[in-house]
């Protein structure tokens, strides 16, 4: 097979997203908007771990969570622009997610809280995502070359 299996990979990615959404709805009772908001905030507030070798080496495993001082604020404006949501709806949902402990309200916006001990609501989610990536590797290895 000389061509990249784009349809196969695309199908797997869509399944990955669908399963992720289902997991979040079932496990946490999130709405689809809440899942989207948390994804944007988590992605942006932990962006540095993907670009800084020290942070990756120090906090990239399950041994130690990224400390709050390395988590950058994500503004209401950024979230509503990124998701195409109304500002007031975005603000209300962010406040509610912070009130429920899923996000931290910090100076300049919101951040994903450090996931440690009893406060770690994302352990099962991380395990789910890692298993899905492992499944993708298995599927890719089976593609004839």
Where are the model-predicted features located?
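Amphipathic alpha-helical interface surfaces
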Residues: 33, 72-75, 90-93
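Short amphipathic alpha-helical interaction segments
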Residues: 84-99
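A short alpha-helical element within helix-turn-helix/winged-helix DNA-binding domains
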Residues: 65-66, 71-81
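Amphipathic alpha-helical dimerization/coiled-coil segments
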Residues: 124-145
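Short helix-coil-helix linker/hinge
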Residues: 28-33, 44-61
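N-terminal leader segment of winged-helix/HTH proteins
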Residues: 1-39
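Short, cationic-aromatic polyanion-contact patches
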Residues: 58-61, 75, 102, 108-131
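C-terminal regulatory/effector modules of DNA-binding transcriptional regulators
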Residues: 34-41, 58, 82, 102-105
């Amino acid at each position: 097979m000389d061509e990249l299996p784009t349809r196969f990979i695309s199908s797997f990615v869509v399944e990955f997203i669908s399963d992720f959404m289902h997991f979040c709805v079932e496990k946490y009772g999130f709405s689809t908007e809440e899942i989207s908001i948390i994804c944007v905030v988590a992605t942006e507030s932990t962006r540095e771990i993907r670009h800084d070798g020290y942070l990756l080496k120090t906090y990239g495993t399950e041994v130690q969570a990224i400390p709050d001082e390395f988590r950058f604020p994500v503004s209401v404006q950024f979230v509503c622009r990124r998701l195409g949501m109304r500002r007031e709806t975005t603000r209300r949902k962010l406040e509610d997610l912070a009130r429920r402990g899923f996000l931290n309200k910090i100076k300049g916006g919101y951040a994903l809280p450090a996931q440690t001990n009893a406060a770690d609501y994302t352990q099962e989610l991380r395990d789910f995502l890692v298993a899905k990536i492992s499944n993708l590797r298995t599927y890719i290895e089976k593609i004839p070359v």
